[in-house]
Amino acid sequence: MQNVNEAPTYIHQFDKDEQIISTQDLSVFYGGSVQKLFNASLQFKKKTITALIGGSGSGKSTFLRCLNRMNDKVARVDGEIWYHGLDINKNNINVYQLRKNIGMVFQKPNPFPKSIRENITYALKANGENDKQKLDQIVEESLRAAALWDEVKDKLDKSALAMSGGQQQRLCIARALALKPEILLLDEPASALDPVSTSKLEDTLKQLRTDYTMIMVTHNMQQASRISDYTAFFHLGHVLEYDTTENIFTNPKGEITEDYIRGSFG
């Protein structure tokens, strides 16, 4: 296989007015000197789904967590992350506000041990919203957006822990949407779900694309090809190729990308 340090990179570029968030020479170090991400420069288009693919340890989840500063306490992050004209990798950024605008859904569903309703309203109340009518409206809007309202509208005061795994994951999406983010980061959101729940989740994400920008880590290449508009391929901490999903899967430009897509390694 071609040496990753000698491999050419093929990175799609967007016009400035198409971008919602971008990175420039983003590098991540653990323990002070162990580098896990090398000079990643990517631009993300508004209201699209981008899949981040690559083998285990390729750097895709490390990259994703940089976008809303989830790596702050565990790693050193060098480089720039541009969002609305601000480099959000700077120390003067309000990280709490940033995470309202750039929400995250994790690999394993993590509902609060509270009612379905309280899962949605908890953060809203913490931000000072106490108007019951407004809270009820946001609960319904968020659950509808996550394609969950019809399944739970008569169970809002029941424990979220009694829901199925697929429902819990969609609840976590609804919980993030309640804060009105522009961007939703998803770290292998379907990896713990059965095929039926995965299909429902994918349908939900495709519907959300009209209003939100989504960036999703996945090991499932079939999933990436089904629902994403763009795909970035990570290998050993390097972004080697970034293009439309159709091009990545049918006409990859890089030798290592082609080997990965064909299943020569994982």
UniProtKB/Swiss-Prot annotation:
- Which positions does UniProt annotate for ATP binding? 54-61
Subcellular location per UniProt equals: Cell membrane
- Chief location of this protein within or outside the cell: membrane
Q: Which Pfam families match?
A: ABC_tran
E.C. designation(s): 7.3.2.1
| Residue stretches making up the ABC transporter domain | 21-261
Question: What cystine linkages occur within this chain?
Answer: none
Which controlled-vocabulary keywords does the entry list?
Answer: ATP-binding, Cell membrane, Membrane, Nucleotide-binding, Phosphate transport, Translocase, Transport
Does this UniProt record's set of keywords contain Cell membrane?
yes
Task performed by this protein: Part of the ABC transporter complex PstSACB involved in phosphate import. Responsible for energy coupling to the transport system.
Name of the featured protein: Phosphate import ATP-binding protein PstB 1
Subunit note: The complex is composed of two ATP-binding proteins (PstB), two transmembrane proteins (PstC and PstA) and a solute-binding protein (PstS).
A GO cellular component annotated for this chain's UniProt record is: plasma membrane
